[in-house]
Structures are given as structure tokens and as C-alpha cells.
Amino acid sequence: MTSARALVSPDRELVPVASAGYVGELDGIRAVAVSLVVVAHYGLGFIVPGAFGVTLFFFLSGYLITTLFFAEYAAATAISVRRFYLRRWLRLTPPLLVFILLATVFHSVSRTSVGGDAVPVGTTLAALLYYTNYYDLFWNIAADKIIPFGICWSLAVEEHFYLLWPWVLRAGIRHTRSVFWAIVAVCAAVLAWRLIARYGLGLSSDYTYMATECRIDSILYGALLRLLFETQWAPAVVRFLRTPTCRIVAGLLLLATFVIRDEGFRQTVRYSIQGIALMPIFTAVLVDDPRSLLRRVLSSAPAVLLGRLSYSIYLLHLLARTPGEVVFGGPYRAGSIISGLLFVLTAAYLIHVLIERPMARLRRRLHEHADAGRPIGAALSRVTGNQQAYGSASIGIVTGDQ
């Protein structure tokens, strides 16, 4: 049995610690992910792997959420599921409401929606209630298909993960190895189901790409990496993941998932290979020397800012092309692309300043109020204080930004 509180020992100096510190490189990863998605959707999808950007978001989400829970447990020997859901709601919902409002206005004014000049109720509810992936797969008819809302499918997958994962960790956080092997089994089962869906049932590539039961492993691979860091195997695992051979193999595996165009491979094995290959890459971001080129690029001011804006950029980038499509006569005209990028960056920054920052402060106040009078201050100081010993290996979450 591995306790989440057993975080420090002399041979664990390279193992990332679950703490409340901020790590700019993770915003840099968000910047890479959203850039891949936007560039692909703005006309270069034939050479830029936009879908991999979503996979990056998934992996990062699994890692960060799991780290948050271990940090909370290390500080208070408890996990508050209620507070977690409240923080998630305050983080995700306000920008989503702005997106839905803007989509309604844009499509009503420009009359670009299919079959009408307003956003249909069905697709709006699907976005608000986080089931866009299934709505688009099974219920979305042509007259009800508003393209910008389709982007919410990945939010639905993450929300479904949030519904289950806090309860799993709260029940099993003192039995990390057991949880780890259970999640390995789930990842294997998800791959098996994709193979059955593709080769046995002949289901569409959209199903294996968007359905929660086909993509949740992309989030779980990130959670697995955090779970590995909480086991007694952690020092050996980190040493292995840092070896040049491991990193080269991981890079080649990722490259293979981009260049192999067989549709069966892309619908099934691709996601599993990417999840495994991301583990050495994320480890490099977490434990390498901060002066390394990778970490300096990811922690640069432009990358961090873009990462902080990434959620709103992701939501708005397709919608942002709408005015340009009307004015310039198509989605991939230079004017449409330039105006779309200017709009999405401006809107995302305004949402960040006017909505996301105030919501982040509210989340922190709620967190501090809930902890008032609880004897966790010293424990939290012990956890975050380990950053002096771990240096660049320290990793954690600020619930307002990370």
C-alpha cells in the first residue's frame, strides 16, 4: 500500500511532487495543444495533426486533476468531491455561456446556420449539459447542426471523466498501486472496445473519435503518469522515462501515429500509442533542467499567455471565422483567417480578464473559506516546501489557472 502522504525520501529527488505550486510549462503545453487545433481547423488540417492537440488536452487534464487530488490529500488527508465540482463549474461554465451567447447572436445575424437563422435548442442544451459528443453522434440532424457547438464534444468527454474520477480516487487514494493496475485494465478495455467497434461492429470513425467510452483512456494515461509518481516504483520509472532511448522511441511512436494513414489504425491503436508516448515527453517537461530548451520555450511569456487563453480560444476559434466567411466569401480565404485569429485572440483575452480571473479569485476564496479553521496549513507548507528540495521536479496546480 502506498500512501499519498509518503512523498519525500532521499531517492525520490527527481519525482514530481503533488503540490500547490504553479508550473508555467504546463500552460505552454496548453499553448501547443490549442495551436495544433486552431491551425488544423484554419485550413492546414492535411498536414497539422489537430486531433493530437485534443489528445494533449486530454492527457494534461488527467495528469493535473489527479495531481490536484493527491495534493489535497497530502495537505488534509481528505478529498472534497463537492468542492471539486464547484471549482470545475466555476472554471468551465462562465466562458461556455459566453460562447453560446456569441454563437446565438452570430448565427442569428449572419443566417449561416443550416436550416434556420438561430441556434437550435437541442445543440445548445447538449453544449450546456456536456453531452455534445453523443448528441452529434446519434441525434444531430442536418437542420440542427451548428458547427461551432460541435467543438464541445471534448468538453463532454472530460466532464464524464470528472463525474467518475474523484470518487475512484477518494476511495482508493491509499491504495495507489491497486488503482494504477485497475486503470491500466480500463485503458486496455477501451482499446479492445475500439477494435470491436471498428472491426466487429463497423461503427464510424466519428464514434471512435468522440464517444466517451472510446476516448476516456486519453485522459486516463495522464492520470496513470501521476499515479506512477505516487508509487514506490517512481524513482525507477522517472529514471527510465528520462533515458535518451526512451525519449527517442516515444518520439518515433508519435511520428508513426501522424504518418500512418490506415483508417483502422487511426480509429483504434493510434490513441493508445499516443497516450503511452506522451509519458516520457511530459516527464521531460516536469523534471528536466529548467534551462533546457524545451522548458524555456514552454515557460516563455507568449506560450504561458496563450496557454492561459487556450480554453476560450478552443471554444471560439471556429465561431470567430463566421464574420470573415460572410465578408470574404469562404472560411479559408486570407481575410477570413486573419480576421478570425484577431477576433479569437481579442475575445479570449477579454474573457480571461473579465471572467476567468474573477472566477479564479472566487474559487480561491471559496477554497480558503472552506479550509478556515482546519489544521492543514502546516501540512500544506510541508508539501509546498518540498519544492526547495525537488527544485525543477516540483509540480502542482493553482486551481485558478492550472
Predicted regions and their residues:
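Transmembrane alpha-helical segments and their boundary/interface "anchor" motifs
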Residues: 71-108, 118-126, 154-163, 214, ...
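Interfacial loop-to-helix transition and helix-capping segments at the boundaries
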Residues: 20-24, 44-54, 117-126, 142-157, ...
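C-terminal "closing" transmembrane helix and its immediate cytosolic amphipathic cap
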Residues: 1-17, 64, 298-303, 318-402
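Functionally critical transmembrane alpha-helices in membrane proteins and complexes, commonly lining
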Residues: 21-72, 90-98, 122, 129-136, ...
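Juxtamembrane transmembrane-helix termini
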Residues: 2, 11, 54-90, 95-113, ...
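Specific transmembrane alpha-helix
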Residues: 53-71, 90, 155-169, 182-235, ...
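Alpha-helical transmembrane segments of multi-pass integral membrane proteins
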Residues: 219, 223-224, 245-357
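Aromatic-anchored segments of alpha-helical transmembrane domains
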Residues: 35-42, 105, 133, 186-196, ...
